[in-house]
Each structure stands twice: as C-alpha cells, then as structure tokens.
Regions:
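A glycine-/small-residue-rich N-terminal strand-loop-strand element
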Residues: 1-19
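Short helix-loop-beta connector
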Residues: 9, 39-44, 64-70, 134-136
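A structural motif shared across PLP-dependent enzymes of the aminotransferase-like
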Residues: 18-31
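Short amphipathic alpha-helix with an adjacent loop that forms part of the alpha/beta core around
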Residues: 123-134
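Mid-domain Rossmann-like dinucleotide-binding core that forms the NAD(H)/NADP(H) cofactor-binding site
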Residues: 47-121
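C-terminal hydrophobic helical "lid"/dimerization subdomain
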Residues: 199-250
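NAD(P)H cofactor-binding loop motif with strongest signal on the N-terminal glycine-rich segment
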Residues: 75-76, 144, 167
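Glycine-rich phosphate-binding loop and adjacent beta-alpha segment
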Residues: 99, 108, 147-216
Length: 250
C-alpha cells in the first residue's frame, strides 16, 4: 500500500485493467483504478472482469437497445459476444447470436445463451427471421467485417444501426448500398471508453461485478498456465475455436 492509501484493505482481492507489465507475480496499480472483488466471484472470473465485459456493456449501451427489442451480433462465441449476450439477457434485450461454425451453437447453449444460428448453414437468414417472429432488429454489432457486415446490415429493420466493433475477417466491409439508401440504415465504428460515456464506467463495472457474483455472467477460462510457460500461453491464446480465455496462475 502506498503512502496515504487507506482503501482497499490489505488482503482484499481486487481486479485491475490496462496495467502494463501485469504478467508477473506482483505489479503496481493506482488504488483508484482497482475494483474490490467480492468473495462470491472466483479468481477465474475476477481476472476477466475489467476487459471484455466492460467493452461489451459499453457497446450495448451505445447501441441503446431497450428491453423486449431485438438486436443481432456476429462472432457470438467470442468473449465480447458471449458477455454481451448474457448482459443483454439480464436486461431483457433479445439477441440473435450468429456463429461461424455449427458447434458454436451448442457451445453457447451450454452457457445458457439461446437464439444462436450458424452462418455456415444454408438458409440461416430465414431462421433469424423466424426467431424474431417478424419483430424488427433495431441494432447490430459487427466484429467480423467483410461480407458478414453486409449480412447483418441486410437483416436490420428500417432505421436500424450497425456498430462495427472489430475486423476478424481482415477484409473491408462489404455492404449493399440499397440497405443504406432505401432502408435508412446506418453504421459507425465503436470508440468506447472515451467521451461522455467514460463517466458511466464505474456504474457499468458495478453492474458487471453484480452479474458475475449472481452467476448471470459466466466468464470461462479454458486453461491457466504458470508464468514460466508464458510463451506457450501466448501461442494458445492465438488459437481459433477456444471455449474460454487463457490465463496465468501464479
């Protein structure tokens, strides 16, 4: 504890994010930048609280989807996708979860995430329309790019908005101008954590901690490595098709 620091208490578990040099048994962090972790949250979940869950929540709030409305996202088996689906469910927002392989549907179901469809299967767009029962999809989160951007945009209802969050396909977005011109759909790139929304981060973190403590937010670790195996852990983190995060256990 630094001079003049009175909280958190010595021995209190905390979570921290955006710390340079954190691949170590010990590191320094500002007291104001750490979040106390309640006993109901284990270490595997606690180590993930300050990264993807916060990004997912801020993206959901930027989209402004209200309870009982529908949105759609791709890359739904990714950390952001799974977290957004769970947070949205807790808020009463319906999410269509698009995955790129059929096994991903079962992976999401094991976490209690429904409304999943594989874009590898023919006619998946028709299945999306059946899921929503004809209700308009008001927002989309695109983490892939390429042709999948246009696929999401096409499924949006009139006046719907698409947020581009990532570019897993490493390709430019391919969209139909007709969706933009005649159906008044639009899109923008996400730059979260700055501007007016930044002031809402403490409240968002509080909600994330609460959802994790109640089990409504499940954050899985596929494998934890000792620090001595950092190189192997880094290689494992780059492998596609993982079902959880790669972590260190000191």
């Amino acid at each position: 504890m630094g001079e003049g620091v009175t909280a958190p208490a010595v021995g209190q578990r905390v979570a921290a994010g955006s710390i340079v040099g954190a691949w170590a048994e010990y590191f320094l962090a500002r007291a104001a930048a750490v979040v106390p972790v309640p006993d109901a949250i284990d270490d595997d979940v606690a180590c993930q609280l300050m990264a993807m869950p916060l990004s997912a929540m801020m993206a959901l709030e930027e989209l402004g989807v209200r309870p009982d409305q529908w949105m759609i996202q791709n890359a739904a088996t990714g950390a952001v996708g799974k977290t957004l689906a769970m947070i949205a469910k807790a808020r009463g927002v319906h999410v269509v979860n698009v995955v790129r392989r059929s096994a991903g549907v079962a992976e999401l179901a094991a976490l209690g995430i429904g409304n999943a469809v594989s874009s590898a299967e023919a006619g998946w767009q028709k299945r999306v329309e059946a899921m929503t029962g004809g209700a308009p999809i008001v927002a989309a989160l695109d983490s892939v790019g390429g042709e999948e951007s246009g696929q999401l945009l096409h499924l949006l209802g009139e006046g719907g908005q698409l947020m581009t969050f990532g570019a897993m396909a490493n390709q430019p977005m391919i969209v139909d101008p007709g969706d933009l011109i005649f159906k008044r759909k639009g899109f923008w790139a996400a730059k979260l954590g700055s501007g007016p929304r930044r002031a809402e981060i403490p409240r968002a973190i509080g909600e994330i901690v609460r959802l994790a403590a109640t089990g409504e937010l499940k954050l899985t670790v596929e494998k934890a490595y000792p620090l001595e195996e950092a190189a192997e852990a880094a290689r494992a983190s780059m492998q596609p098709g993982r079902t959880g995060k790669i972590a260190f256990r000191a």
